[in-house]
């Protein structure tokens, strides 16, 4: 019977939906090593040194081969919103997996033209970008509130897993004969797209989308299966009516346009999501993940493939900690502390690299290089448990269902835009100012901590509907961690006012309870129709 599938459902959802993150990570983790392989450079490099018999890529070509996947991803995450609204997240995920697979095939079969690989990277990026919006969104809409943060963190866990495995594959293939060096490294990514596409076929559409398109009975069935309860049970019916009421209320103003996500009721969260996702890239994480091979070479490391693999292993291992950190300490504090920690690590990394790495005779200082690797590992230790997963959690859970697809698309587009800018311009900047580049990232990390302190509210343990009420209230972000919004009591107040003839849109008293006080202060906010 259907209700017996509940426990397995969450596990299956975690694995197959999060595989979309693996696809993203595999591309990120492979490109740096692939573009450094001998056969790849012999075919696609635009520079040759006859004295050393070494081929190399110019900064422009290196930046294009590395960064164009992000251009495709930017486009993919924008078009994912209207497609998901039309076909649902489940079918959209399947479709964009197919797009990703086509892009990988074109890369593997590339003729001796670097332009074909660049174009294929754009096509692959369309799939990756769309899935970076759809996968966390599907998880947020389907997972129970008590584990929603953990569920969404699994997406980032699989991103880091993909990066690490790609580094391991590069380590094993870079000595193979001729084109096998890079074709195997790229081609194995087909497997991740196929696994994701097949796995999602066995998962249901999210109940929120089903209610949105009028398939209420199917939504109740999905709710009952995930909760391991009968469809007519009180818990399932209460959850269904809560979702139904929330969705009807939010869609009363008509279809959501792109302009409406910048309306006064939602623009605070729209800009917050854009800032958080932009700052996630500006932490400097992809400085190591895209160019870890080159960075390690510059630091005088003899085995850059091994060093890059070590960095990726630290990233993957520490992401498991993020699953605990976000559920135990919430969203705000880890992001604030993580930003400060990462800023310190980058400052030391850059100071050592720019002042102590090279002796006067031009040889590298191995001790200074070791310190830089330690600082890079400590940076990743903090990033993997804070900014890496928390940014996706905030974007996945902060928006009302009417605005969710478009707001998440705009926020994630900001992430991909900065991803491209960093990946493309890093070779130029690194060649110009060297390791002083890290001072820029140190400043951005500190800025990120300040932005979170001033603008992000604590949402740990709240339902998506309660989160909406929290952001509609007047609670200051730095005070939001002390309060647990009592959604059911607030609804009782609304119903009482409605019963007495109160018009919709009137001032509603939001009843909130402080977790550390006996009093029950009230906050007044204007709940207006979303137009």
From Swiss-Prot:
On this chain, the residues bearing Phosphotyrosine are 523
Q: Which Gene Ontology cellular-component terms appear in the entry?
A: plasma membrane
Q: Which residues carry this modification: Phosphoserine?
A: 507, 515, 519-520
Q: What does the record say about its membrane topology?
A: Multi-pass membrane protein
Write the record's keywords in alphabetical order, separated by commas. Answer: Glycoprotein, Membrane, Phosphoprotein, Sugar transport, Transmembrane, Transmembrane helix, Transport
One GO BP: carbohydrate transport
Q: Where in the cell is it found?
A: Membrane
Its primary localisation, in coarse terms, equals: membrane
Q: Which CDD domains match?
A: MFS_HXT (cd17356)
Q: Where is this region: Disordered?
A: 491-531
Topology check: give the Cytoplasmic ranges.
5-13, 84-91, 138-148, 205-270, 327-332, 389-408, 458-531
List each coiled-coil range: none
Spans through the membrane = 14-34, 63-83, 92-112, 117-137, 149-169, 184-204, 271-289, 306-326, 333-353, 368-388, 409-429, 437-457
Xref: Pfam families: Sugar_tr
What GO MF terms are annotated? Answer: carbohydrate:proton symporter activity; galactose transmembrane transporter activity
Annotated glycosylation sites = 361
Residue ranges in the Extracellular topological domain are 35-62, 113-116, 170-183, 290-305, 354-367, 430-436
- Composition-biased stretches (Polar residues): 514-524
Q: Which PANTHER family match?
A: HIGH-AFFINITY GLUCOSE TRANSPORTER GHT2, PLASTIDIC GLUCOSE TRANSPORTER 4
> What's this protein's function?
High-affinity glucose transporter.
The record's family statement is: Belongs to the major facilitator superfamily. Sugar transporter (TC 2.A.1.1) family.
Q: What is this protein called?
A: High-affinity glucose transporter ght2
- Supply the source organism for this entry: Schizosaccharomyces pombe (strain 972 / ATCC 24843) (Fission yeast)
- Gene encoding this polypeptide? ght2
């Amino acid at each position: 019977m259907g209700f017996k599938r509940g426990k397995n459902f969450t596990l299956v959802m975690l694995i197959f939906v999060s595989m979309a993150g693996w696809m993203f990570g595999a591309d990120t983790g492979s490109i740096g090593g692939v573009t450094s392989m001998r056969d790849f450079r012999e075919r696609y490099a635009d520079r040759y040194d006859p004295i050393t018999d070494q081929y190399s890529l110019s900064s422009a070509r290196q930046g294009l081969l590395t960064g164009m996947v992000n251009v495709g991803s930017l486009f993919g995450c924008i078009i994912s919103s209207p497609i998901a609204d039309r076909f649902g997240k489940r079918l959209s995920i399947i479709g964009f997996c197919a797009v990703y697979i086509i892009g990988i095939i074109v890369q593997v079969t590339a003729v001796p033209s670097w332009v074909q690989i660049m174009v294929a990277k754009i096509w692959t990026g369309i799939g990756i970008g769309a899935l970076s919006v759809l996968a966390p969104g599907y998880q947020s809409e389907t997972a129970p509130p008590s584990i929603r943060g953990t569920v969404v963190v699994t997406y980032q866990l699989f991103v880091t897993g993909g990066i690490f495995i790609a580094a391991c594959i590069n380590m094993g293939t870079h000595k193979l004969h001729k084109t096998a060096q890079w074709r195997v490294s790229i081609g194995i990514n087909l497997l991740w797209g196929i696994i994701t596409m097949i796995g999602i076929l066995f998962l249901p559409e999210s109940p929120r989308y089903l209610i949105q398109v009028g398939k209420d009975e199917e939504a109740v069935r999905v709710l009952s299966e995930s909760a391991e309860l009968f469809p007519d049970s009180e818990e399932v019916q209460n959850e269904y009516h809560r979702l139904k009421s929330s969705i009807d209320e939010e869609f009363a103003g008509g279809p959501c346009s792109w302009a409406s996500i910048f309306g006064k009721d939602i623009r605070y969260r729209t800009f917050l999501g854009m800032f958080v996702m932009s700052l996630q890239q500006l932490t400097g994480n992809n400085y190591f993940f895209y160019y870890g091979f080159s960075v390690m070479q510059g630091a005088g490391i003899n085995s850059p493939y091994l060093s890059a693999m070590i960095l990726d292993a630290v990233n993957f291992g520490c992401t498991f900690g993020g699953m605990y950190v976000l559920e135990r300490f919430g969203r705000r504090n880890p992001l604030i502390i993580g930003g400060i920690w990462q800023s310190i690590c980058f400052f030391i990394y850059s100071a050592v690299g720019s002042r102590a790495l090279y002796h006067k005779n031009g040889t590298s200082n191995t001790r200074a290089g070791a310190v830089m690797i330690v600082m890079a590992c400590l940076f990743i230790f903090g990033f993997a448990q804070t900014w890496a997963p928390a940014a996706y959690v905030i974007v996945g859970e902060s928006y009302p269902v009417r605005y969710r697809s478009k707001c998440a698309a705009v926020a994630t587009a900001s992430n991909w835009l900065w991803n491209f800018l960093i990946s493309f311009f890093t070779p130029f900047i690194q060649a110009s100012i060297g390791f002083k580049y890290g001072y820029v990232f140190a400043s951005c990390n500190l800025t990120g901590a300040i932005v979170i302190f001033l603008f992000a509210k604590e949402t740990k343990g709240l339902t998506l509907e309660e989160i909406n009420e929290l952001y509609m209230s007047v609670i200051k972000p730095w005070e939001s961690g002390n309060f647990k919004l009592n959604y059911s009591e607030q609804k009782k107040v609304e119903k009482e006012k409605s019963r007495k003839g109160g018009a919709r849109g009137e001032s509603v008293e939001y009843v909130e309870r402080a977790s550390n006080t006996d009093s029950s202060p009230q906050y007044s906010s204007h709940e207006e129709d979303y137009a």
